[in-house]
């Protein structure tokens, strides 16, 4: 947090205070604020808490993606239309400020056309029109109803309740006027892709407008306006309760569905996608709010100065609302730019929360005096530090319990998290240090700023480490030097500052404790870290052979196996990347998976006809399995390989790249703050908001780390899910002691054994050595998931995992050491011997089933990577 507040610059503060009139958007008159800030944080907690619950439900596979479609249909086809119809019927158009509406519309149109033109100029010819159609919609369409309305209601319900109705007017107007242009571009791209250049231009335009009319938001707005005049702004009693029931169900279900749709959206992104995402999110969350606010300032000349200022502030907050999920639906319908749009929707949703909080805080602040603002920033920093400290302790515990801190790059990430933890603790201690306690201030300052500079520097060092990890077949990663630099250089800088700097004893702000010298030191540290991180990430992109990053939790570069660590010999890999599981069996790896383009891929599931040692198992599988008892994890080679994979097989490069990019954004904000203070004494409203943003970033970095590393699927989410299921099953078992396995699981297992088991064994089971003289017929969890999807027993990977878990509970399959539940990962499982009651039915039915499998196998697409 780099602030200008100090007694040394009191004259500057006075001049600054004189240049901030009410027209700048702040309440500088001492009048009551135009919005209720006390209700904002509970509203944000409510909205994002429900979103998080939905995300956890999807991540833990409690609700699969197929099941989530039902909730999505209810939200879009019943709850939202009822909400729109109800509010459009009772809307009083005589109270609407139409100047405000067209000002916001002009602001959105400006961003739309800027993004569209720049995309047409820069994008490659192959996908120019699809990008020019979807990117402007992404930058202008907000999540007005699910996220926007609860926040506007919390802020303005008690002061300007009429502002709530603008939500229902701005969204459909922009949809009707801007979205058709984007749809027309997408139809043009669709025509080019199908090589149908002769398609009628009028038909393309008509299809664009037809998609708009099919949108339930637009359709129900027209119907609601018509009934507004027919019913004279009053809903009949017999309809009111029915509409209320549907409309009231929208908010919670829509937010929960939003969380469900976020699972697995950040997937394989091309090397330029992160740059595109950064630009689009900047346009949506920064450029759009500023333009909307300035348009209202220029065009809406109301009679009341207070109301005019409040409307301009409202326009800014409206622009900060995150991207609507509907944009991802449009991208999926056209099958264009799906990865960028869906990933951007997820990121913008969570980035918008702190921006909304900071903006609303500033817009309601009663005065622009320097001293109260400095205390306000201190209070915000203290509050955020408390919550961030808890998040960081949780994230560090995850790294320790999962033992990921022993591997790279998590070892370096742990150092970053420790530095962030010390920053939060230092800020909390600084808040209690007396201003007259010089020694105490010096000691806490050293603790606070040596760790803060360390977080700045660790961003660059982590990016360098990621680049070196990509190149480590030719470059050895100097871990010791990096760790010493990450802690030693910041300590050295603070020591030099203590010796050469001039202490400002009257400052209550730690960011200006040593005045100009401290600002220069901070700026140099930030610039160096940004430069190092930026260059490293660009070089890392250039060295990525496949031209894409992998999704969260997926492996992209694996730690090489040390010689002699297992009894298997290393085979030549098709790329320069080391193999995850080396094998002595020449024709296949131990996991039936191969490395291609730097990533693990499971092969397509089809019958193998070779007669190698690792060939497919015969249907009489039980007779050839020599290791039928549970393996000892201490001696079983396969179990040792699993342990090696779990500890070092997933460096989570995409998570680390995303962490670096988000931290670089905060570093840019801090650098801008320093340079603004050093070279421009004409501070203004944007500068003050920049200070709050810097405070939120510096002491809230723990939220970023928690979001990326704190929700470990297998260490947190799935065990919590299993614990709930255990407690629930205990209650059911108390009522029925004789049925430990549910009838549903029994039925699933019986059907699988009777109709699918033998064919599944022939397709995916491979015989692998598990000891010096023993072998076992095993398969990977991801192999079974792929097979279940291809033969139609599951519609997606989530349902396939549920199916596999039922087979484990029913005793059909088992993990080789019986230590893990069924996972969509490279873990080894075996089929258990058939029990006497599992005898198959007539052979003719099985033959018919196999015939249908063969037809599916010939037409099935290549398998996809496992979901983690």
Curated annotation (Swiss-Prot):
It is found in: Lysosome membrane. Residues 378-715 are annotated as: GPCR. Residues 844-857 have a biased composition (Basic and acidic residues). Residues 755-833 form the DEP domain. It comes from the Eukaryota. The chain crosses the membrane at residues 37-57, 78-98, 103-123, 132-152, 166-186, 212-232, 242-262, 272-292, 314-334, 345-365, 380-400, 413-433, 437-457, 479-499, 519-539, 659-679, 690-710. Residues 1-368 are annotated as: PIN-like transporter. Residues 1-36, 99-102, 153-165, 233-241, 293-313, 366-379, 434-436, 500-518, 680-689 are lumenal. It is a multi-pass membrane protein. Residues 550-582, 836-868 are annotated as: Disordered. One of its GO terms (molecular function) is cholesterol binding. SMART domains: DEP (SM00049). One of its GO terms (biological process) is positive regulation of TORC1 signaling. Glycans are attached at residues 9, 17, 27, 307, 379. Cholesterol binds at residues 41, 55, 264-266, 655. Widely expressed in adult tissues and during development. In brain, widely distributed in forebrain regions, while it shows a more restricted distribution in the midbrain and hindbrain regions. Expressed at highest level in the lateral part of striatum and hippocampus. PROSITE patterns: DEP. Keywords: Glycoprotein, Lipid-binding, Lysosome, Membrane, Transmembrane, Transmembrane helix. One of its GO terms (cellular component) is lysosomal membrane. Gene3D superfamilies: Rhodopsin 7-helix transmembrane proteins, Winged helix-like DNA-binding domain superfamily/Winged helix DNA-binding domain. Residues 58-77, 124-131, 187-211, 263-271, 335-344, 401-412, 458-478, 540-658, 711-868 are cytoplasmic. Cholesterol-binding protein that acts as a regulator of mTORC1 signaling pathway. Acts as a sensor of cholesterol to signal cholesterol sufficiency to mTORC1: in presence of cholesterol, binds cholesterol, leading to disruption of the interaction between the GATOR1 and KICSTOR complexes and promotion of mTORC1 signaling. Upon cholesterol starvation, GPR155/LYCHOS is unable to perturb the association between GATOR1 and KICSTOR, leading to mTORC1 signaling inhibition. Binds indole-3-acetic acid and may play a role in tryptophan metabolism. PANTHER family: DEP DOMAIN PROTEIN, INTEGRAL MEMBRANE PROTEIN GPR155. Homodimer; via the transporter region and DEP domain. Interacts with the GATOR1 complex; preventing interaction between GATOR1 and KICSTOR; interaction is disrupted upon cholesterol starvation. Cholesterol binds at the interface between the PIN-like transporter region and the GPCR domain; these two regions likely coordinate to sense cholesterol and regulate mTORC1 activation. This is Lysosomal cholesterol signaling protein. The gene is Gpr155.
